[in-house]
Amino acid sequence: MARVMALKTIMESKRSREPAVRTIYKICPAPAWREAERAGVYRGSPDDARDGFIHFSTAAQLPGTLAKHYAGQSGLFLIAVNADALGAELKWEPSRGGDLFPHLYGELDPAAAETVTTLVLKADGRHLLPENLT
């Protein structure tokens, strides 16, 4: 019984470190996403392959992710995915500044996308994010 209680405490502690955020976002070049839709699977970018997981961001993390990795790039999609639909393959892990970032250790089924939005590139090289991000 003590072992079961200890395991329950560990699991509750782990869940409490996961953000309450339920929608996460993948930034993806439009041609790569269209190919994933045709193939029925998205395996990630070259950076994702190098790191061993597909990088996602929360709405709050998107401006930093775009500035650091995608400044000045046009032709990008913002793919919204329900984090709960990804199951145990989704891990929340510390990254820049200790923030927890969502990482998918597996392939993404394009059918899991709730929305796919074209990111508008402004004249200053920054992207215009949709107003309704959660």
What do these predicted ranges mean?
Residues M1-P19:
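N-terminal amphipathic/basic-hydrophobic helices that include classical n-h-c signal peptides
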Residues K14-T134:
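Conserved, structured core segments of small domains
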